[in-house]
Every structure is written in structure tokens, then in C-alpha cells.
Swiss-Prot record:
Gene3D superfamilies: Hotdog Thioesterase. This is 3-hydroxyacyl-[acyl-carrier-protein] dehydratase FabZ. Belongs to the thioester dehydratase family. FabZ subfamily. PANTHER family: 3-HYDROXYACYL-[ACYL-CARRIER-PROTEIN] DEHYDRATASE. The gene is fabZ. GO terms for molecular function: (3R)-hydroxyacyl-[acyl-carrier-protein] dehydratase activity. Involved in unsaturated fatty acids biosynthesis. Catalyzes the dehydration of short chain beta-hydroxyacyl-ACPs and long chain saturated and unsaturated beta-hydroxyacyl-ACPs. Transmembrane segments: none annotated. It comes from Parvibaculum lavamentivorans (strain DS-1 / DSM 13023 / NCIMB 13966). GO terms for biological process: fatty acid biosynthetic process; lipid A biosynthetic process. SUPFAM superfamilies: Thioesterase/thiol ester dehydrase-isomerase.
Length: 158
């Protein structure tokens, strides 16, 4: 990739930039925007949880609750976008493969109308392997947390 083709590193990302950074698309895109990115150290992503989310049809009818695994996915996507942005590449050139989830805790349900703030903080990185601590918060209250491991690789790498 030439210098002219390297996307600018930004300290936040609207939905258009998120779509450039990540290969995920509806219905699996779990981040609407990123309001803060600090190098490869930390980021805060936003997920506006609406009643129109497809997972609410079955989880649970009459009492919709965002599945915990999708809160973890939102954390992984926020961390992935942070790493891709830091490296100055795009989701079309690199993929972030989710490798591990440790110490996952779900403390409160996330429901339609909530704004999920996804905080990720780097624990360590070695080469292409990255580890982050993630926290999900609604109205400033912790709703979920975990540690995430991921590997970054070029498209087509297995």
C-alpha cells in the first residue's frame, strides 16, 4: 500500500469510518461509532440498542435482552477498529481474528433504548497478537466485562 493509500489515523470514527475499518456488516456490525481512540491503547465505542435489532425476535419474546455474546462482540469490534486504525490500514486489507475470551461477567441486562458504551483498554500486544480488557456500560453502570485476545492478519491469511 502506498503512502497515498494509507487511511488517516483518527481519534474518533463515525459510522462511515467504522465501515472502512471493519469488515462486519448488518446484522453483525455491533458498533455505531467510536467516540474516542487513543493510539492502540484504548477506545470507547457506542452501540445504540434499538427494538429493531434482529436478535430481539428470539431473545426473548416479550422481554428483549441483548445477548451477552453480542456485547462481547461489540467489545471485540471496538478493539479491532482501534488496532486497524492504529496500524493505518483498513478492514479491506486486514482482518482481526477473535481468539480468546476470558473472565467474562454479565452484570445487568442491556435492553432496547439503552446506549451501550464499550470501553476497551490494551493489556498487551506481541507482534500480531493483541489482548484487551473490555467493559460495557449503560448510564455509567458496568453491565459486562471480559478480557479479549485477537490476532491481526492480512486478507486470505489462515
Amino acid at each position: 500500500m502506498s503512502e497515498a493509500e494509507v487511511p488517516e489515523k483518527l481519534d474518533s470514527a463515525d459510522i462511515n469510518r467504522v465501515l472502512e475499518l471493519l469488515p462486519h456488516r448488518y446484522p453483525m456490525l455491533m458498533i455505531d461509532r467510536i467516540i474516542e481512540m487513543k493510539s492502540d491503547e484504548s477506545a470507547i465505542g457506542i452501540k445504540n440498542v434499538t427494538n429493531n435489532e434482529p436478535f430481539f425476535q428470539g431473545h426473548f419474546p416479550g422481554h428483549p435482552v441483548m445477548p451477552g455474546v453480542l456485547i462481547v462482540e461489540a467489545m471485540a469490534q471496538t478493539a479491532g477498529a482501534l488496532v486497524i486504525n492504529h496500524l493505518g490500514t483498513s478492514g479491506s486489507n486486514q482482518l482481526v481474528y477473535f481468539m480468546t475470551v476470558d473472565r467474562a461477567r454479565f452484570r445487568k441486562p442491556v435492553v432496547p433504548g439503552d446506549v451501550l458504551h464499550v470501553h476497551v483498554t490494551k493489556i498487551q500486544s506481541r507482534g500480531s497478537v493483541w489482548k484487551y480488557h473490555g467493559e460495557g456500560k449503560v448510564n455509567g453502570q458496568l453491565v459486562a466485562e471480559c478480557d479479549l485476545g485477537a490476532m491481526i492478519a492480512g486478507q486470505g491469511t489462515k
